[in-house]
Regions:
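Conserved G1/Walker A P-loop phosphate-binding module
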Residues: 1-129, 139-151
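Conserved catalytic-core segment of NTP-binding enzymes
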Residues: 131-173
Length: 173
């Protein structure tokens, strides 16, 4: 089966709308991947200037270092965009970003010596940031993604050691 038959099959099974779930540990470059994917495949397919600017504004932030940047699952762009995968295969794509599973040494989830408590749409009460991140990541993997893409790292993109990522990668896979 050549690759375009695979794409045609996915299009038929999903009614032409693909949700690409980008998952993995925190601080691996998930949001950076989404921004780059959008730069190469989504933004060039938008002809309406206003829609293109809105879509740029919807892209996630990214940065170097150990601080967790993403704080909740996010669908990017807000509205699916048509992308040609071959001469005769066109699908509508949205990416789904998530916080990811916690990695030892990452920062941003602890404040004044205790784990931050956050409000989520899943509970009526506050829960620990790490728990919310895990639930959101699971929801992206199990409930939203048509295709899942696991992002890992060798540790060179942050100041975190490679071995710190392994438990979170195992949870993801």
């Amino acid at each position: 089966m050549d690759s375009f038959q695979v794409y045609r099959d996915i299009k038929a099974r999903t009614d032409g709308e693909i949700y690409l779930g980008v998952v993995g540990p925190v601080r691996t470059g998930k949001s950076t991947f989404i921004k780059r994917f959008a730069d190469l495949l989504i933004l060039p397919n938008l002809t309406d200037v206003h829609k293109k600017e809105r879509t740029k504004d919807e892209l996630p932030q990214s940065a170097s270092g150990t601080t967790i940047m993403t704080t909740e699952p996010k669908f990017v762009p807000k509205e699916a965009v048509s992308v040609k995968l071959g001469e005769d295969v066109e699908v509508k794509i949205r990416l789904v970003d998530c916080v990811g599973y916690m990695v030892e040494g990452a920062s941003g989830h602890i404040e004044n010596g205790t784990e931050r408590q956050v409000k989520t749409p899943w509970f009526e009460y506050e829960i620990p940031f790490t728990k919310a991140a895990a639930i959101g990541t699971q929801k992206v993997i199990h409930d939203h993604a048509t295709i899942g893409l696991v992002v890992t790292t060798d540790g060179s993109v942050t100041e975190l050691a490679r071995e710190n990522y392994i438990p979170a990668e195992e949870k993801t896979v």
